[in-house]
Amino acid sequence: MAAAALLLLAAAAAIVVVAMVLRWLLLLGGPAAGRLGKRALMPPGSTGLPLIGETLRLISAYKTPNPEPFIDERVARHGGVFTTHVFGERTVFSADPAFNRLLLAAEGRAVHSSYPSSIATLLGARSLLLTRGAAHKRLHSLTLTRLGRPASPPLLAHIDRLVLATMRQWEPAATVRLMDEAKKITFNLTVKQLVSIEPGPWTESLRREYVKLIDGFFSIPFPLANLLPFTTYGQALKARKKVAGALREVIKKRMEEKAENGGSIGDDEGKKEKKDMVEELLEAEGGSFSEEEMVDFCLSLLVAGYETTSMLMTLAVKFLTETPAALAELKEEHANIRDMKGKKQPLEWSDYKSMPFTQCVINETLRVGNIISGVFRRANTDIHYKDYTIPKGCKIFASFRAVHLNNEHYENARTFNPWRWQINNKLQNAVGANIFTPFGGGPRLCPGYELARVVVSIFLHHLVTRFSWEETEEDRLVFFPTTRTLKGYPINLRLLSESIC
């Protein structure tokens, strides 16, 4: 019996391997090989090893502080648009800003958003990142309604209060891991915007599970992963259930409250401003959003609000620390604002608009740090670009990083130089030509990009006017599975005044 079972298992495994090899061989020709014949000239490149392609080479490069060689070497051999094979399928990589611009603008027509199956499963099919067409348009519009108004006085006051509340937990002379502290701020802010829950045991428990979920984004989602909880992907799947479950409980309770109130939310039926995103969803389109849609949507906004903004905060401090002249100029700008307002007055929109050098620092941090390395798209139709045809169904990766760090577009591109943004036409030209695309572009332009700038600006204001700091040890950046520092960027803090109230 045991021998027969083993033989059966071996046969099944052999069939799976043969099927995977055949799939890989078919990918060499691709879906357009028969359809287009000789006209289907794919961008040049290499599919790497059978089954795994060049995935291990890409991961190996992006787990270092200098992942550029992976793309640079292939661009040198094949040009700005080349073919590789990563994460289980053939993928066209673009380091060409003109082609990237085409891809961003063609969302919903020639291409659609497409990400590795691990991300799709963990975020949910109804998430903002993965929905398409009319569904994406309505979610994007709702996000803009809630997060695209950073000038709102209540929101500014809440950001200011939350940043200071986190800093009050730091000892007058403390060592903190800045990346972790920044993530607490952005996570708590996002949770507040989503479900109106203040920081506490519930939010911290949710955050711990959420970190496990994020770790699984670029892991290999093999079929039995859900049965193997010791794997990164298995742990991420379990964490996803817990995070979704916690959000679902809040949403269910709010739906019940709405039903008890005869279809209205709360006592003040005439109020113009919704208190959070769940309320926006419950009221939108006559309450047509399902429970699962709301769960997936809220979970995806946690990703957008948590990982990217917190890394922007961390990298801004890291790059400023490594560039003393920039730090000195930033301190002067914020000291002037503090002196005009008084230390205990919360920041207002007019103060934010009085931070021009801060915006230069944020732009340069986005350009050099490349928190979002690029975006995945899938061709809805055959795409003809220059002498190449990218067939329908092919995965495409538009690399923002390759463009941002190209000396053809930025002088000494790999040097942190915030002063380059003080020349207004430089910024306008870069943005207008889609050479500077840290928040994407086209219909999928990040709806919370201005809010992210406001959060980082307020954080930097309170940090530089209340603390001095120094790195406790050398820490380096890596870019897989997400952009982060290996040690969380530990720094020694020293309070500059007696109180940070």
Swiss-Prot record:
The keyword Isomerase does not apply. Keywords: Brassinosteroid biosynthesis, Heme, Iron, Lipid biosynthesis, Lipid metabolism, Membrane, Metal-binding, Monooxygenase, Oxidoreductase, Steroid biosynthesis, Transmembrane, Transmembrane helix. GO terms for molecular function: fatty acid 2-hydroxylase activity; heme binding; iron ion binding; monooxygenase activity. The chain crosses the membrane at residues 2-22. Induction: Down-regulated by brassinolide (BL). Catalyzes the C23-alpha-hydroxylation step in brassinosteroid biosynthesis. Converts 6-deoxocathasterone (6-deoxoCT) to 6-deoxoteasterone (6-deoxoTE) in the late C6-oxidation pathway and cathasterone (CT) to teasterone (TE) in the early C6-oxidation pathway of brassinolide (BL) biosynthesis. This is Cytochrome P450 90A3. The lineage of its organism: Eukaryota, Viridiplantae, Streptophyta, Embryophyta, Tracheophyta. The gene is CYP90A3.
